Amino acid sequence: MEMDLNNRLTEDETLEQAYDIFLELAADNLDPADIILFNLQFEERGGAELFDPSEEWLSHVDYDLNPDFFSEVVIGLAEKDGDEITDVFARVLLCREKDHKLCHILWRE
């Protein structure tokens, strides 16, 4: 898979795309109680954080997770606004290269 460093989503675009995908698929993958909790608390303590892909993804996908092209977005709730997310609802792996639409999600269980 050939990728172009000059054809990547920005960090903000990556966060936005991951969050849009999360919202679209959450109803089919989260418990109704979790969806209610997330919706009620997101404005005060919710967030999406961008990371390099964690090693855990290697057991779920079979390609090189070069951090130049792949990002992990953690979506969930923090204890308070500005804190690190501790209550994770989804971890989204996205390819940032615009011509390679790859996405995998690990949902809260």
From Swiss-Prot:
InterPro entries: dsDNA_mimic_put, Put_dsDNA_mimic_sf. Belongs to the putative dsDNA mimic protein family. NCBIfam families: PRK05094.1 (NF003469). May act as a double-stranded DNA (dsDNA) mimic. Probably regulates the activity of a dsDNA-binding protein. HAMAP family: Put_dsDNA_mimic. This is Putative double-stranded DNA mimic protein ESA_01547.
